A protein has these predicted regions:
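Conserved alpha/beta enzyme-core scaffold
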Residues: 1-232
Length: 232
């Protein structure tokens, strides 16, 4: 099962949802063996975000954009507790759109002749990524020009963060400091047949939100959780 969530450092983190996931694993031993995807860097050194997921058995694989802001996950990466692939953030953003559109992947020059190039590390961040035999990127030659092909994958469940949701599930982001790709992730998950759970600061009645303020339409949202003020 592939699980994804948004966040850029501590901005736009669905913190209550991630904490609840951690507590459920600690108390019940499930879910487990999740394949984790995030586009950027959702965490803050040794607290918040992905650091709550740093438990052996909870995460079996990581596909992300940056690991240093999730120090506890980074420690597990160094211990080869799971395969870790670090993919350029811009590629991850485009992958969400490609997943939403049902495409097999994206073709781009981003990452050529860098660690992302399969002739070098192919986005592998630890030995476990080499040992697992999986690949996330391939080298293509089109009209005598080199490109990289990054593969898409289905997303089974995602957590996103908004400010307000109405009772129909429409989400606005008026108090969010960073506009994370919550729409792209929601569409990618929905079109994969997955579930979209949103954490918000408050709940409003249907019909009270201005249509132009809505960032994620309610038809994409499966569940709404009103979070704690300290985790907004």
């Amino acid at each position: 099962m592939t699980f994804a969530f948004t966040g850029f450092v501590s901005f736009g983190l669905p913190e209550d949802l991630v904490i609840t996931l951690e507590e459920k694993f600690i108390n019940e031993g499930s879910p487990k063996n999740l394949s984790l995807f995030y586009d950027a860097a959702p965490g803050c050194r040794e607290a918040h975000g992905g650091n709550h997921l740093a438990h052996r058995g909870l995460i079996r694989r990581i596909h992300g954009g940056h690991l240093d802001l999730n120090r506890k996950l980074a420690a597990l990466c160094s211990e080869n507790a799971m395969p870790v692939f670090m993919v350029p953030q811009d590629v991850n953003s485009h992958l969400l759109r490609a997943i939403a559109g049902g495409e097999p992947g994206i073709v781009t020059k981003i990452g050529l002749k860098t660690y992302a190039d399969p002739r070098q590390d192919g986005c592998r961040a630890n030995q476990a990524a080499w040992d697992c035999g999986e690949t996330v990127v391939e080298l293509l030659n089109i009209d005598d020009k080199e490109y990289l092909f990054y593969k898409t994958f289905p997303i089974d469940i995602c957590f996103i963060k908004g400010t307000t949701a109405d009772t129909d599930g429409n989400v606005t982001v008026e108090h969010e400091a960073v506009l994370n790709p919550i729409l792209e992730l929601a569409v990618a998950t929905h079109n994969s047949g997955g579930k979209v759970i949103v954490q918000v600061d408050r709940l409003a009645q249907a019909g009270t939100l201005k249509p132009k303020d809505v960032k994620v339409p309610g038809l994409l949202v499966d569940a709404i959780v009103v979070g704690k003020p300290e985790n907004s």
